[in-house]
Structure formats: C-alpha cells, structure tokens
Amino acid sequence: MSVTLVSAVDPFPTDAGKKVVLAGFLEYFRDRLGPQDVHYLLVGGQPQSEFPVTLHPLPRPSRKAALTAVARRVPTGRATLQESLLYSPEVQRAVQMTLERIGPDLEIYDTIRMAQYADEAHADRQLCYLDDLFSERYTAMLDAADRYPDVTIRPLGNFAEHVPRRLRPLADSKLPQRALLRMEATLARRSEDRAALRFRRNLLVNDGEAARLAARVANRGSADVIAVPPLVKPPQYRQRQYGGAPDFVFLGLLSLPHNEDGVRSFLTDVWPTVLTRMPRARLRIIGRDCSPELAEVAERFGGSVTREGYVDDLTEVLSSAAGLINHLRFGSGIKLKVIEALGRGLPVISTSVGADGFATGREHGVLVADHATQFAEAMAELTDPGRNREMSDSARGQFETTYARDAVFACYDKAFALR
C-alpha cells in the first residue's frame, strides 16, 4: 500500500502547530508502511536530502497565475482568496502527473487549499485534512474585533509567504481587513461544505468543529467528518519539582494573530491584577517573532516579564513553572502548546476559547478563567505545591489517555483505515 500527502507546507522544522500535525501524519505512515511507500507532494518545495519520506517538490503558482486565479475565481464565489493564491493550471498538471506516476492507494489533501487539486475520478481513495475550520477562525476574528476595541488582528499569519508583498498591507488595515475577513469566511464556509460532501472522509483536530461541519451539511447529503488528535513529539517528562515560586509561562509562535493578541491582552488586562495579588509573580514569554508593539507592552512591566524567544529544550522551563498561561480571545482548532504542557505534567490556566477541545477542570489539569480576577485566583491556587502536584498528575493523565503515541496511532489506524 502507498499513500500520498499533498500540501504547500513543509512540515520541518516543526515550529508551528500545522507543521506538527503534518509531521505527525508522516511519522505515522512511515511507521506503518515504510518511507518508500509514503509520498509527500510539496507545492513550492525544494529537494531535501534529509526528508523522512519520499519527497516530490512541485512548482508554486507564478505571481501572474495566482493573481489571475484571484480575479477569475473569488468574485464568482468559486474559491477563497487562499485557494486562489495557491492555484494554477501548471500546478494542477504537476500534481496529477505525479499522482499518476505513483499510483497511490490513499490520497490526503491538506485543507481546502490543496483539495482543489483532487481529481474526482479517484474520490474513493481521497481524504481531506481540514486542520481547523477557516470559516470559524475568521468569524471569531471579526467577533473579537467587535468585542475588544483594542484587538489587533493580523489574519495572514504563516500564510503571508503566499501573498504578493504589495497586497499584504490590505490585510492589516482595519477597513479592508474586515471586508476581506467577512468575504473569506463566507467563501471558506462554502469550500469546507463542498469538501465535507466531496471527500470520502474529512479530518479536523477539534471534536466540536467536526460535529458542527457535519451538522452544516446534514440536509445536503452524507458526510464523514471526524476529529483526530495531533501526534506531538513525546515531551521529555520528569517528575516536577515545583517549589511554590509564582513563575508562569506563555508559549507560542508570536506571529500567529491569536497568540500575539492573547499575550498582549493578558499583559494589559490581567497581569496588573496578578501582580497586586502576587507581587513576586513572573511571566516568561517563549516564542519566536515578537512584534515591536508586543515588546513595548512587555517592557512596561520591568523584570516581572521576560521575552525569551525560541527555546529548543523546554524541560527545565516547564518543569519548574507553576502553570502555562493560555489567554486566547479568539482562535480555532486545538492548541498544541496545551498538549505540550499536559505531556510534561504542567497545569494550564486558559480562557474558554483556548481550552476548546480539551477536557477541563482540576481533575483534567486545565483550569478555565475568562476574567482577570478569575485568572489571578487560578494562578494563585497553582502556587500551592500540594494543589499543583495534584493538577500536575491530572494533566499528565489527560495526555496519556488522549495524546500519547499509542493513543494517537490507534486513532489514526481507524481514521485512515490501515488496521
């Protein structure tokens, strides 16, 4: 048996959530089938000597082709901006020629962006990995902008590399940004619904989103939509030796809009309340691509907040912290940083948005707080070594049950029907 994955994302290095999921798929298929029968079609990719499976670099759409696709497809409602920017007839031919040469038994397309290249003649062997629902992501951004006047939204995130440089400022200016988000949410919903009905099976990482997508199309036909957990690199686990210091961690790629807004709003809205309650509290912000605006906010709090950039080995940091801060005001999917914390037995304090998709409560190692006073109280609770130890065990238990390698592989066996 052979399998192909078609994507415009290089999974390595695994420095973003989407990359972690794709790398996990490759690890699973490599384990089950062997590297010679796992093929990765990478649109816009380059040859690599160390890639773990068989890599097939494909051309990316030229700027002219991408803009032509936008002009022809977006106004008619045929495709989203992101689909159009990644479409060209040349890439279509390259994908189909490569698939014909391989003759795979299973084809997996990475989100609606690559689903447009699937040949319906082979629908019985095709799956679509939808990641999270883009339509809900953009709607959540708009809702957050309405609820929080201070919110700063950068909707392009990691997709910016596929957008012509001259067009990128439009996505960061408020008036065109809101219009673009509304349009993209509507178009993405159409494409997601189309994928749900078109593919043999559709995969998401969030149970709630999977159920909502299935319900959206229930009156139009049969759709197989399921949630699968991401396979994360097993975190180096050692028994935590927490001693009671009020040290907390925010972890995440700061170029992602929900992370940047989350840590900035935490600093402005919650951190002063925390410092009033715990004057010795300390927040360590770990993650690449901190904007100058966020850096300026962090510097207002002096030594109580440190920006540490990318940290390769998180063992020491997370084993001694009181908890992980996951203060998100918008977002979709499931947050890999929470899984990382659970795997290390680190309790999590999260907004309800950030905890979506996880089991919550003290018995699961995840506390939910949506207001500054609630957050401060939850953080203070975790500075009690005994309570922290109990929640640490609960966090580790949730990881072992749902996100450990054996549990994820068993889920993938069913999702991909290999066992």
Per-region residue spans from a language model:
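N-terminal subdomain of nucleotide-sugar transferases
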Residues: 1-57, 276
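Conserved catalytic-core segment of nucleotide-activated headgroup transferases in glycan assembly
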Residues: 21, 174-182, 186-189, 194-197, ...
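Acidic donor-binding loop of glycosyltransferase active sites
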Residues: 200, 319-333, 346
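Short hydrophobic beta-strand element within catalytic cores of glycosyltransferases
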Residues: 337-340, 347-351
